[in-house]
Amino acid sequence: FEKFSLSGNGVEEIYLHNGGKIGVMLEVETDKPATEEVRTMAHDIAMHIAAFSPSYIYETEVPEDYVAKEKAILLAQAKNDPKNASKPDAILEKMLSGRLQKSLKEICLIEQPFAKDSSITVGQLVANVSKSAGMNVRLVRFVRLVMGEGLEKKSDNLAEEVAKMSGK
């Protein structure tokens, strides 16, 4: 579990969804005391995180090994496509950069279309609120928890269980 504590101005938002089955903690940093507009934005973004399950806030946080694996998968898929059979690897890699960017946008919160207004991204929402509130606003970190996630489910085979009980 993670411990959240503000080191200055900002907002710590906690959002529980679906009767507490999904929980989100979000830390938002500001350079001035947070306004109601910033608190509302933090709440809305926490709801967005609960719904869309981003893995990271910013693209710079995505581990290099994830990007390398994703590139390898996309390259293998492209090579297996008969339409690309005669294309050299250099051309395929250029084609794949767009697909890779799309994949990264799906897992990075700041690049996702905002749940309450899909005409803007979460990043644009933060920039808009930052401008209208007259302060710097930055998403610092979040944790999304799902009840039961990470627990091993005991799977029993009914036939084996009956056989054990009957001594066979």
Residues of each region from the PLM?
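N-terminal assembly/interaction segments in proteins that build large macromolecular machines
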Residues: 1-168
